[in-house]
């Protein structure tokens, strides 16, 4: 039971980050039906910028919280600029092109941003500054740290803030109108180009914060970190229903839980070595290591992509998505 509760805590923490990143995918897709595969690299840039700023400010004597906040405050505008430039220079000229063209462009932008980051920060795995001391609390047999609590709280606040923006503001109304029908929205006075640009900028800002949270939680940053993180967040968006904001939130949390529970419970087959033909079949592995691991924490990515495959096969519209026909 304690293990189950611990994996729930770990899954909620990781899933909260996935949910925030997934919002960037689902917002863009909801507006222009584009899967922005470069969004993971925006998250990576946010983590890298924060890494640089936090490293520079850590020896100055500022409080750890202030240092992290300044690092995040520096990462957000940089990522917003990257997101705006991406939309303005790479995607807007292709808005009327066949859907495959912007998709290929998104992959190209992703590779470009990766290599630019490699030139700036090197190809090495960077140790993200751990300047906030971890304090553990016991919750029903599970251990949860102050960092995990902060990550979950920040992600919940971001998701709540985005929901208010989308459903309670004039910009949100314009975004929903553009998602429904850009042509009609334009006829009604909505500046469609500005709304689309704002969507990219908001998604990039969320990605910047997610990058800082991810680096703080896992303690590492690298120029390739956006690839797997981005694909996991995309899986979360598909799981919840791509283009559906509540679906992205739900999908992110569920994906984090599936990963954590899968890594925690599936994989240690050591007990099977004691039984009959299984012992004979795996005797070499058991004799060499004393146990046989099929999955586990080293293979937790498998569970994320298995979820993606299963959803695409059995429910392509996602948990909260609606099946709609192609636009005329």
Predicted regions and their residues:
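Single transmembrane alpha-helix segments in multi-pass membrane proteins
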Residues: 4-53, 85-101, 237-246
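Alpha-helical transmembrane segments within multi-pass membrane transporters and channels
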Residues: 61-109, 116, 250-255, 259, ...
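Hydrophobic core segments of alpha-helical transmembrane domains in multi-pass membrane transport
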Residues: 47-52, 75-82, 107-117, 154-163, ...
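Membrane-interfacial amphipathic/re-entrant helices at transmembrane-helix boundaries
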Residues: 1-21, 49, 60-69, 97-101, ...
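Membrane-embedded helix boundary and interhelical linker motif in transport proteins
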Residues: 9, 31-85, 89, 220, ...
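Transmembrane alpha-helical segments in multi-pass inner-membrane proteins
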Residues: 18, 68-73, 200-207, 214-305
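Transmembrane helix-bundle core of multi-pass membrane transporters
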Residues: 93-94, 99-168, 195, 219, ...
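Helix-loop-helix "hairpin" substructures at the membrane interface of multi-pass membrane proteins
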Residues: 143-224, 245-251, 255
């Amino acid at each position: 039971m304690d293990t189950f509760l611990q994996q729930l805590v770990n899954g909620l923490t990781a899933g909260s980050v996935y949910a925030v990143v997934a919002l960037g995918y689902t917002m863009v897709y909801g507006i222009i039906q584009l899967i922005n595969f470069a969004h993971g690299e925006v998250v990576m840039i946010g983590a890298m910028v924060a890494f640089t700023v936090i490293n520079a400010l850590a020896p100055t004597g500022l409080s750890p919280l202030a240092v992290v906040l300044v690092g995040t405050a520096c990462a957000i505008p940089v990522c917003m600029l990257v997101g705006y430039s991406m939309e303005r220079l790479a995607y807007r000229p292709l808005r009327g092109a066949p859907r495959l063209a912007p998709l290929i462009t998104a992959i190209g932008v992703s590779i470009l941003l990766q290599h630019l980051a490699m030139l700036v920060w090197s190809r090495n795995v960077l140790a993200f500054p751990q300047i906030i001391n971890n304090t553990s609390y016991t919750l029903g047999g599970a251990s949860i740290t102050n960092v995990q609590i902060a990550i979950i709280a920040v992600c919940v606040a971001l998701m709540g803030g985005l929901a208010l923006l989308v459903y309670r503001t004039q910009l949100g109304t314009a975004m929903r109108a553009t998602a429904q029908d850009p042509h009609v929205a334009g006829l009604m006075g909505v500046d469609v180009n500005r709304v689309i640009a704002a969507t990219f900028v908001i998604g990039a800002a969320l990605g910047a914060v997610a990058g800082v949270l991810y680096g703080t939680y896992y303690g590492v940053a690298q120029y390739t970190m956006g690839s797997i993180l981005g694909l996991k967040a995309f899986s979360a968006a598909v799981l919840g229903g791509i283009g559906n904001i509540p679906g992205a939130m739900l999908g992110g949390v569920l994906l984090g839980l599936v990963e954590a529970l899968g890594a925690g419970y599936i994989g240690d087959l050591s007990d099977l070595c004691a039984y009959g033909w299984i012992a004979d079949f795996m005797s070499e592995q058991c004799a060499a290591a004393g146990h046989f691991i099929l999955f586990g924490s080293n293979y937790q990515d498998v569970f994320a992509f298995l979820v993606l495959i299963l959803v695409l096969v059995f429910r392509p519209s996602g948990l909260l998505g609606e099946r709609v026909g192609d636009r005329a």
